[in-house]
Amino acid sequence: MTMARDLLVKNATIVDVITHSTYGGWFTVRDGSLAEVESGAPSAASESSASAVVDLGGAYVQPGMLDIHMHIESSLVTPRRFAAAALPHGTTTILQDPHEVANVLGGPGVRWMLEASRGLPQRVYTAVSSCVPATSAEIETPNASISPAEVTELAREPEVIALGEMMDFHGLIDGDEHLAAMLRAGMEAGLTLEGHVPSLTGPDLSRYIAYGIRSDHTLMTPAKLLEQLRKGMWVMIQEKSVTPAVVSTIMGLPDRSRVLLVTDDVMPNRLLGGHLDRIVRRAIDTGWDPIDALAAATVRPATYLGLHTLGTITPGAKADFVVTQALASYPPTQVYVGGRLVARAGALTVDSIPAPEPAPIAGLVEEFDANAFDAADFKFGAHAGGVGDAVSGSPAGGQAERLNVRARVIEANDENSFTTLAERDVTLEDGVPVDPGLVLATVIPRAAARPGAAPYQPVMVLIDGLGLTTGAYATTFAHDSHNIFVTGRQPATMATALTAVLEAGGGMAFAPDAPAAEPRGQVSLLRLPLAGLLSDEPVATVAADFDTIEASLRHAGMQARNPVLLLTLLPLSVSPDFKVSDKGIVDVQGRRVLTPVAA
């Protein structure tokens, strides 16, 4: 019996991620799925029955890659713009957790991301964000919330297959009933429960897992990896965890079926140069077996999520595949989704991304008076959490006020987002620390723009270790509540950067310092008009503005590999160990807020 075939691909070197081998063969596509997958060469009859025949001349064919822990918003673009950039790198399926938009807009924000992701050539599944807000209102001012009832409602959407990372791990193991109810709602809806465990070990980790949480993607060490695997977790390795020690530990495991590769967060400039393919390549370069690394980005994530028709080159699987000239050689030469060629040589083959722009969404930023804050608001001790009785000294006639204060200082570093806290004697001159290594920082809640809200007075915090010696940075993209984060050395420059962001209706800005008698220099600006988080411009356009801001930050002294990412994580109130909120300094482990001035 002759079978009609939409496409026949021959002379392929097929990567078998199940048996960890390769073989020469051919396969056919029918109605978007793989029909025959065979070794050797097809018969003349098979070729003649195909509507189209592609001869790969021995090129490699691997399954399309699945990134099953990621946040589209980290690339600062809408889903359609993200798909246009990620598809040419071979990422054919993603599981997005839109917890950035969710933290600003709640359940309607998740639904907006669902709608904006439909009709794309990339397969987009969604996790309902579990920690909105990420922590309690006593720690920081939230902008939105998601209830267990909303989880149940959103889970009815066919693309919703998971409950996003449970970030408030301390709250959960301490018995927070709301968090437990969120997990119960997810479990009852049949969703995969995702974890976020940067520091739990021993009995605390066991209690966390016992709620039904199945995975972790945070920074790994060999010991952490082994404990989580022993306790039944699926371990997701993102780029910062691809170290020689971790890879060596993974390669020493007799069973690696629960070890996956993910991206988590990819900034727009990095997205231009690669997506999950870059993580796979780095893993291989660090000593990971090539086909095993591919399995960690294809069949294993598909198995984890129960997406059994994805992640393999086998009969009945969706015809999502990637063509490379050599094993795991990227970028791919061709990318297919459902048997349709969607990308070739690093670019989309057709205008396959839907043309209509996504519906506009607001996020309170546009409600601010752009000039609501001035230099006086950004002096240390100007408002709540100020210097009080902890100061000494007095201004000399005609000189700037000079004071001494016992302050709590957040100590950051260039390598990661972990921070410590120290108490120091700090000298202030007109509200600015004399020590050039210290910067001022504050978070302004979006809620301050709500009609009828009382005027907000910023609480200033001191941070050491950023390397920022000049200029100021402001952003409406600040994990996880995405209130407005501002940092710099000079209060007037901080006000300039903030004004630029507010005038734009959201975004990121870097403002250079300038002498008081001179006009301000050119402000570098990246506009994010959709909820203060996203742009619908092409990734290349957004990346260019992003690069300008990163270059400005580096020129201003920052040495971090990803300076913008580091700054956006400083307000993340569930990330160890001390962070900045609109209330003051967050002691993450102690689940409390400390004043910037030591008692």
Explain the meaning of each model-derived region.
Residues A12, G32, G58, H69, ...:
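Divalent metal-coordination and catalytic microenvironments
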Residues S39-P42, P98-V101, S129-S130, D168, ...:
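Short, ordered loop/turn segments at secondary-structure junctions
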Residues S145-E165, G171-I237, S241-L261, L271-D292, ...:
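Histidine/acidic residue-rich metal-binding segments in metalloenzymes
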Residues R80-T192, A517-R520:
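Divalent-metal coordination cores built from histidine and acidic residues
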Residues D6-L7, P63-M65, T93, I161, ...:
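Hydrophobic "anchor" residues on beta-strands that sit immediately upstream
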Residues M1-G25, V29-R30, L87-H89, L271-G287, ...:
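Active-site microenvironment of metallo-dependent hydrolases
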Residues Q62-H69, Q96-H99, A127, G164-M166, ...:
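Active-site neighborhood of phospho(di)ester-bond hydrolases with catalytic His/Asp-centered motifs
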